[in-house]
Curated annotation (Swiss-Prot):
Biological processes per GO annotation: ribosome disassembly
HAMAP family named in the record: EF_G_EF_2_B (MF_00054_B)
Taxonomic superkingdom: Bacteria
Source organism of the structure: Limosilactobacillus fermentum (strain NBRC 3956 / LMG 18251) (Lactobacillus fermentum)
Keywords linked to the UniProt accession: Cytoplasm, Elongation factor, GTP-binding, Nucleotide-binding, Protein biosynthesis
Coarse class of the protein's main subcellular location: cytoplasm
Chain's gene name: fusA
Name of the protein described by the UniProt record: Elongation factor G
Single Gene Ontology MF annotation: translation elongation factor activity
Keyword Nucleotide-binding: yes
Residue ranges constituting the tr-type G domain according to the UniProt record: 10-285
A cellular component term, taken from the record's GO annotations: cytoplasm
Record PANTHER family: RIBOSOME-RELEASING FACTOR 2, MITOCHONDRIAL, TRANSLATION ELONGATION FACTOR G-RELATED
NCBIfam families: EF-G, PRK12740.1-3, PRK12740.1-5, small_GTP
Amino acid sequence: MANKREYPLEKTRNIGIMAHIDAGKTTATERILYYTGKIHKIGETHDGASQMDWMEEEKERGITITSAATTAVWKDTRINIIDTPGHVDFTVEVERALRVLDGAVTVLDAQAGVEPQTETVWRQADDFNVPRLVFANKMDKMGANFDYSVKTIKERLNVTPLPIQMPIGAEDEFAGVIDLVKMVAYIYDEDKLGENWDTVEIPADMKDEAESRHDAMIETLADVNDDIMEKYLEGAEISVDEIKAAIRQATLDQELFPVMAGSAYKDKGIQMMLDAVLDYLPSPVDVKPFVAHDEEGNAIELTAGDDKPFAALAFKIATDPFVGRLTFLRVYTGSLKSGSYVLNATKGKRERIGRLLQMHSNQQNEISEVFSGDIAAAIGLKNTTTGDSLTDPDHPLQLESMDFPEPVIQVSVEPKSKADQDKMDKGLQKLAEEDPTFKAETNPETGETLIAGMGELHLDIIVERLRREFNAEVTVGKPQVSYREAFTKQVSAQGKFVRQSGGKGQYGDVWIEFTPLEEGAGFEFEDAIVGGVVPREYIPAVEQGLKEAMENGVLAGYPLVDLHAKLYDGSYHEVDSSEAAFKVAASLALRNAAPKGGAVILEPIMKVDIVAPEDNLGDVMGHVTARRGSIDGMEERGNAQLVHSFVPLSEMFGYATTLRSATQGRGTFTMTFDHYSAVPKSIQEEIIEKNGGK
């Protein structure tokens, strides 16, 4: 058990590997682990043998679902790697990873360049100010084109790429790369799993092109670096070290994004990519100070260092079959020994760290202490959930929490037997702890269990995990859309609840003004009572009554959202008034306001990006309009077209099959939640009728 810092902070890298699905990201991570000596046999994703894809569901589907954290050592530096999913249903895993990373490697498919999901994860990385390198992977693939990939970075991501290599050959002829910084060539030995390569002079027939690309690289650097600009204008020699220092600074400032070439599957270019991680991506010391807040709400800037009070963020909860509940931590400042107490500043509870583990995919090495800049997993934290701040009990700090999107799709799940009921309940509770975008609840009227998530694949995998990890056999209903309800007009209404039939009666009377708010604003309650017409002690009951009534909506039983309620008048009875009576009165006011408040049903609208061959463009546009969608623009993608559109989620069920048959399997689409919008009147009536009205 190691207990002193093995690698200085400057020699630590916390990086993520991010990409569009099928760009070869998991294979690239595998190769990193192989060359850094962490694994002895390479696992291929398409054989279901990859180390990082450790859940059974991932092995079967060949996609990465949970971002496994692993640690590796390259040269004299420790690299903590978080492998993130590329499928849109799992964007929350990407957000979680980016929140705690210092830098990232974006893997592109060199034939496709920047794809829709690349754009999504790139924008997420922008939100978290994460410096990035780009690795144009699959250079051995038919149609691979490095220059095209670089062009797509510029055009689709709207940033300045900096090619620091050029490939030697492409497709079957891909043999190695030219290093434009050192101006040498690396030619790989075909037989040795990429472990051997020769550093040679640039081939004579490529020398002129390499020179001109080197000059272009220097010009791009000169635009963002005054020292390079000065030497460039004077025609002075610029050393390799000066070039590297300038690239590093421009990468850290996110002014430039170095681009490299390789083929993870054919074992080419990975070691150079690792060198670039060391040369150009930040250590915890290089990143901007992290902002936290003390108990008074004052902003405090945290910079990495072991000699400061302990502060960490819990960024993921996972259930391990052998050790139970694992809490993944990113330590920002200070150090922590196993067995010590921490304060969960988010929940205001003290917790004891049982054991500390360093993770390698799903295998663990026990350690006795973690330090500033580390990523590790803790056992023993019972009350900690994703996004909680863990700090030194004497120095409580609130690290900025994470925001997660609300689920947009739900299905009912029913246990097949009584024994399955308990297993299912336990499993759903555990899975909801792990994943903030997954929710499970019981419908109070029908008693059925509903699970909600970010997409069909997300829920498929939840059900699969119930079966596999918790032995719960369940029947799954048809997917349903998570509709909402909203007012569209300002309206005032009275709610009066009076019951006087012998004995103690009930009396509550309120006047409330309801004002619709913009999407995502939530519920706001305003107490505007003057002169005690509604006594103080009943006002919280009015607010609570409204909240409970809003949960069940006013039209078809869906939650009513984004509403400001101003309680401005009412009356009470000395004897008969009670909290319960005012709760009922508040719910009646809401019900009475609905007809004049222009209540509507809102549906989730998805951003749907469809890539289809040119010949099928007419069909695809027809698909969008037939599904009540709108086209938002098109771009050429080689000999295919990318159609940007917005389509209601309710119309997208089963679309994968439609697209597959229309394009003979050549079309693909990605779908992410964009916003909520009112459904057309006719559809609103159908929904109300189907739900039996209110």
